[in-house]
């Protein structure tokens, strides 16, 4: 189940909790973020190649490319046995921005996005079928969990793909990791 919690950036008071998909989409639209529920009915082997996953969703990827001018797409696929899962998690947990507009479509698994526009932090638990945009220059971080299980198509407006500009902030340390978030809010 997708979930949105909205926190003051201090992280010191109880958040607003939103569980219904249309309400999540409406609140995120207020900050320029697209949230949609898509069909993600295809099953993949744990070691499925990026091209296999992109080919399975080629029509959807092409529609998004045409609509938003995306130049590239890739797949982040991380399971509990991934040899670099700890390094990837540590990198994604650091607050950063991107100079381009990006979209994420979860085709398997889940992950926790934190968006930090202004003085609020929006935590979005994304699961299979969720599509989420990250507007350009929006401070954010992502937690895939200690035992990740996700396949996510990422679309970029630049050919370079995922290029992060890390802010140097430790704000991510003040908010719960995926496992604690699930215990408290899910």
UniProtKB/Swiss-Prot annotation:
Catalytic function, reaction form: 1,2-dihydroxy-5-(methylsulfanyl)pent-1-en-3-one + O2 = 3-(methylsulfanyl)propanoate + CO + formate + 2 H(+); 1,2-dihydroxy-5-(methylsulfanyl)pent-1-en-3-one + O2 = 4-methylsulfanyl-2-oxobutanoate + formate + 2 H(+)
UniProt binding sites for Fe(2+): 96, 98, 102, 140
Molecular function per GO: acireductone dioxygenase (Ni2+-requiring) activity; acireductone dioxygenase [iron(II)-requiring] activity; iron ion binding; nickel cation binding
Record GO biological process: L-methionine salvage from methylthioadenosine; L-methionine salvage from S-adenosylmethionine
Assigned keywords, A-Z: Amino-acid biosynthesis, Dioxygenase, Iron, Metal-binding, Methionine biosynthesis, Nickel, Oxidoreductase
Cofactors required: Fe(2+); Ni(2+)
Pathway(s) it belongs to: Amino-acid biosynthesis; L-methionine biosynthesis via salvage pathway; L-methionine from S-methyl-5-thio-alpha-D-ribose 1-phosphate: step 5/6
Annotated site, May play a role in metal incorporation in vivo, chain positions: 95
InterPro entries found in the cross-reference section: ARD (IPR004313), ARD_bac (IPR023956), RmlC-like_jellyroll (IPR014710), RmlC_Cupin_sf (IPR011051)
Annotated SUPFAM superfamilies: RmlC-like cupins
Enzyme class: oxidoreductase
Residues that hold Ni(2+) according to the record: 96, 98, 102, 140
Cofactor annotation comment: Binds 1 Fe(2+) cation per monomer.
Keyword presence, Coiled coil: no
Its EC number(s): 1.13.11.54, 1.13.11.53
Pfam families per UniProt: ARD
Site positions per UniProt: Important to generate the dianion: 104
Task performed by this protein: Catalyzes 2 different reactions between oxygen and the acireductone 1,2-dihydroxy-3-keto-5-methylthiopentene (DHK-MTPene) depending upon the metal bound in the active site. Fe-containing acireductone dioxygenase (Fe-ARD) produces formate and 2-keto-4-methylthiobutyrate (KMTB), the alpha-ketoacid precursor of methionine in the methionine recycle pathway. Ni-containing acireductone dioxygenase (Ni-ARD) produces methylthiopropionate, carbon monoxide and formate, and does not lie on the methionine recycle pathway.
Subunit structure: Monomer.
Family designation: Belongs to the acireductone dioxygenase (ARD) family.
Protein name according to UniProt: Acireductone dioxygenase
């Amino acid at each position: 189940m997708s979930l949105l919690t909205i926190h003051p950036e201090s992280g010191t008071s109880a958040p607003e909790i939103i569980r219904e998909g249309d309400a999540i989409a409406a609140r995120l639209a207020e900050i320029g973020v697209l949230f949609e529920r898509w069909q993600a009915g295809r099953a993949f082997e744990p070691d499925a190649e990026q091209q296999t996953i992109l080919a399975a969703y080629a029509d959807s990827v092409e529609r998004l490319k045409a609509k938003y001018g995306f130049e590239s797409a890739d797949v982040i696929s991380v399971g509990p046995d991934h040899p670099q899962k700890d390094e990837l998690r540590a990198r994604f947990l650091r607050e950063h921005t991107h100079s381009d507009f990006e979209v994420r479509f979860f085709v398997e698994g889940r992950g926790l996005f934190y968006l930090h526009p202004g003085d609020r932090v929006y935590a979005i638990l994304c699961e299979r079928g969720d599509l989420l945009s990250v507007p350009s220059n929006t401070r954010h971080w992502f937690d895939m969990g200690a035992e990740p299980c996700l396949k996510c198509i990422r679309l970029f407006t630049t050919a370079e793909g995922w290029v992060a500009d890390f802010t140097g902030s430790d704000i991510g340390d003040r908010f719960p990791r995926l496992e604690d978030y699930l215990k408290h809010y899910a």
